[in-house]
Amino acid sequence: MSEEKPREGVKTENDHINLKVAGQDGSVVQFKIKRHTPLSKLMKAYCERQGLSIRQIRFRFDGQPINETDTPAQLEMEDEDTIDVFQQQTGGSC
């Protein structure tokens, strides 16, 4: 029989990141997400929680649009970073 030791470092607190999602109305929703999880999961959860359609809003981080396939690791997000949410503007004429 071989002794199985628990593998250290597999589950670390660094696997997760706390992110804030700030709406235009001043509301802030916090999420805990894995660094390598696509942000689409967070986006969909935010929309469900706020009663919004994902097609009606845009998510931005540091002024740059976020794609559904982006991950916190790819965007070099750090703990407690904030994602901004904007209503998509439609139409408009002079």
UniProtKB/Swiss-Prot annotation:
There is a cross-link at K11 (Glycyl lysine isopeptide (Lys-Gly) (interchain with G-Cter in SUMO)). It comes from the Eukaryota. GO terms for biological process: protein sumoylation. Belongs to the ubiquitin family. SUMO subfamily. PROSITE patterns: UBIQUITIN_2. Keywords: Cytoplasm, Isopeptide bond, Nucleus, Ubl conjugation, Ubl conjugation pathway. InterPro entries: Rad60/SUMO-like_dom, Ubiquitin-like_dom, Ubiquitin-like_domsf. The keyword Nucleus applies. There is a cross-link at G92 (Glycyl lysine isopeptide (Gly-Lys) (interchain with K-? in acceptor proteins)). Gene3D superfamilies: Phosphatidylinositol 3-kinase Catalytic Subunit, Chain A, domain 1. Polymeric chains can be formed through Lys-11 cross-linking. Cleavage of precursor form by a sentrin-specific protease is necessary for function. Its main location: cytoplasm. This is Small ubiquitin-related modifier 3. The gene is sumo3. Residues 15-92 form the Ubiquitin-like domain. GO terms for molecular function: protein tag activity; ubiquitin-like protein ligase binding. Residues 93-94 form a propeptide. Signal peptide: none annotated. One of its GO terms (cellular component) is nucleus. Interacts with sae2 and ube2i. Covalently attached to a number of proteins.
